[in-house]
Amino acid sequence: MPFSTSDGIRLWTATTGTATGRPAVVILHGGPGLWDDYAVLAAMLDDLVVVHRFDQRGCGRSDPSDVQTLTRSARDIDELRAYFGHERIVVIGHSFGATLAMTYAASYGDHVAGVVYLGGVGVGDWRTAYDEERARRITPEQDARLQELSGRQRTPAEETEFRALSWFTDHADRERAMEWAYASAAVDLPINFAANRALGATGRLTPDEQKAQAAAIRAPVTFVHGAGDPRPAWAVRDLADHVPNHTFHLIPGAGHSPWLEQPERVREVLRAAVMEPK
């Protein structure tokens, strides 16, 4: 069902679940510049709460938008909340969506019942450790092919290959990593690289600013991180330590999308997170 923001951008949305009196859930996708692909997470919660998903402005099935800031994206979430008639919501953000979830919780705290920070990057120099682990997981031949594809126009088949080579290192299970990466890569939606660059440039807080933002959040925050995610868990723990009301769950044998490798454990954690807020 389409929804239009106050500045006229139509957002693709999907709603599932059961109205039970608990705060509804809004799932925030990653990227930035990708799209919602989280029906599997919604299905884990559908018997407990209403779950809303959407493609962020300029992304996936939503309208194009030249306005790409975390402030505007957080406002979009709150406009969606009001449109669907919820006083308070639980926001579940994955990857970049985790950063957006924290921004929303810090900016619209009166409307936040809880936050799930799923597979985020945390605080500090996470990039060095990430690059080192990614280099360990990719062969020289694969890396050379990725670099060759990244520097030119790509056919549809090459675009799928480019995405798979970019994403397969995110998974802890090395035997199934490429299979999962190709499944995500084959989605017939364009990556919004302009949004990726813009949000990367405008959304960067200093470590001290991130910690101050985290300290200002009063809602319970559930941090969930795959032990096999190349993004280091210590950076997420460091951020979590600055949130007054938080829990931290490190999922063994799981990578950046831990529900693929450890679905039952992720289901257990997510259900606990949405059942806690009153």
Each PLM stretch: what is its role?
Residues 246-278:
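Catalytic active-site module of serine/aspartate enzymes centered on a nucleophile-bearing elbow/loop
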Residues 52-96, 268:
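Active-site loop/oxyanion-hole signature of alpha/beta-hydrolase fold enzymes
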Residues 7-63:
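Conserved HGGG/HGGXW glycine-rich cap/lid loop of the alpha/beta-hydrolase fold
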Residues 230-235:
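Conserved alpha/beta-hydrolase "acid-adjacent" motif
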Residues 217, 223-225:
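Short beta-strand/loop motif that positions the catalytic acidic residue
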Residues 150-199:
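Conserved alpha/beta-hydrolase catalytic His-Asp/Glu region
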Residues 87-130:
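Conserved hydrolase catalytic core segment
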Residues 115-152:
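Flexible "cap/lid" loop of the alpha/beta hydrolase fold
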